[in-house]
Amino acid sequence: MLTQLKAKSEGKLAKQICKVVLDHFEKQYSKELGDAWNTVREILTSPSCWQYAVLLNRFNYPFELEKDLHLKGYHTLSQGSLPNYPKSVKCYLSRTPGRIPSERHQIGNLKKYYLLNAASLLPVLALELRDGEKVLDLCAAPGGKSIALLQCACPGYLHCNEYDSLRLRWLRQTLESFIPQPLINVIKVSELDGRKMGDAQPEMFDKVLVDAPCSNDRSWLFSSDSQKASCRISQRRNLPLLQIELLRSAIKALRPGGILVYSTCTLSKAENQDVISEILNSHGNIMPMDIKGIARTCSHDFTFAPTGQECGLLVIPDKGKAWGPMYVAKLKKSWSTGKW
């Protein structure tokens, strides 16, 4: 069952690195990451080094697969060392590159596992979802973090929003593939501009996840069209504004005392720390929450950027720990502004 997909791996190796993007990254990230950029660049440009974690679906638990994973040397994320780590979440990691086959979508049959970059589970764990809570996944497609949220707890209400119509279809299929019908009934899927969610549903949610549209460094680095890649470089400077607007909307949708987690899959300081700094400077009712404990307890599985992350964590790809990029920041809303 754990035969690696050599054809897919070779396909990735055949992809060409986009020199325009790599040069852009080199100029920016060598300054922002310092010496760490050399290793990060090596991993990002070598798909043969990439790793894939296996998140088991508690609604159709694959006991035989779990045995196979143990035999192959896989281990569970954090092995229970994280505070408030849900026992229902089983995510298996391997130190060696490779992946197991993806399962096909079959109507009426729940998938047994979800393949993901292990770092993408950290925003979900940081949210600390509890049974019965109302939660919003503001930018939910393709659905991996929504699936992970439902492995953690059974919310009273889960609102999965995605503005892009093509990605929305992907999101719906993902949910149908992993979640049983009784739980589907507590999930709402919408196609609303995330910047308007706060006005549409003010102070509705206990927890909000904003996995924001971002540069998506891994994918962008292998752009097949250099002209489009160059265009994206100029458009990239507009992303922080969008991210800030999404966060402001999310804050409106969050009840007083509620928790918001912001995440991206880019190394960019402008899209990570600078965005959070702008929110903290412009919202007196928003306070940063310390998540440095995650870095301390997960250091055996992830490498974190050592500096420049005052209000969050940045997972950077490393040898034997090829997870990330993934930025995570956790915020708390202290009181209501009463302005919608």
UniProtKB/Swiss-Prot annotation:
Keywords for the protein's UniProt record, in alphabetical order: Disease variant, Methyltransferase, Mitochondrion, Primary mitochondrial disease, RNA-binding, S-adenosyl-L-methionine, Transferase, tRNA-binding
Subcellular localization: Mitochondrion matrix
Any one Gene Ontology cellular component term annotated for this protein: mitochondrial matrix
List of residues binding S-adenosyl-L-methionine: 139-145, 162, 193, 211
Result of altering residue 265 to A: Catalytic mutant. Abolishes ability to methylate mt-tRNA(Met)
Reactions this protein catalyses: cytidine(34) in mitochondrial tRNA + S-adenosyl-L-methionine = 5-methylcytidine(34) in mitochondrial tRNA + S-adenosyl-L-homocysteine + H(+)
GO biological process: regulation of mitochondrial translation; rRNA methylation; tRNA wobble base cytosine methylation
Role summary: Mitochondrial tRNA methyltransferase that mediates methylation of cytosine to 5-methylcytosine (m5C) at position 34 of mt-tRNA(Met). mt-tRNA(Met) methylation at cytosine(34) takes place at the wobble position of the anticodon and initiates the formation of 5-formylcytosine (f(5)c) at this position. mt-tRNA(Met) containing the f(5)c modification at the wobble position enables recognition of the AUA codon in addition to the AUG codon, expanding codon recognition in mitochondrial translation.
Source lineage: Eukaryota, Metazoa, Chordata, Craniata, Vertebrata
Protein name according to UniProt: tRNA (cytosine(34)-C(5))-methyltransferase, mitochondrial
Family assignment from sequence similarity: Belongs to the class I-like SAM-binding methyltransferase superfamily. RsmB/NOP family.
Gene: NSUN3
GO MF term (any one): tRNA (cytidine-5-)-methyltransferase activity
InterPro entries membership: MeTrfase_RsmB-F_NOP2_cat (IPR049560), MeTrfase_RsmB-F_NOP2_dom (IPR001678), RCMT (IPR023267), SAM-dependent_MTases_sf (IPR029063)
Associated clinical condition: Combined oxidative phosphorylation deficiency 48: An autosomal recessive, mitochondrial encephalomyopathy characterized by global developmental delay, microcephaly, failure to thrive, hypotonia, muscle weakness, external ophthalmoplegia, and seizures. Laboratory studies show metabolic acidosis, increased serum lactate, and combined oxidative phosphorylation deficiency in skeletal muscle.
Residues of the active site: 265
EC numbers: 2.1.1.-
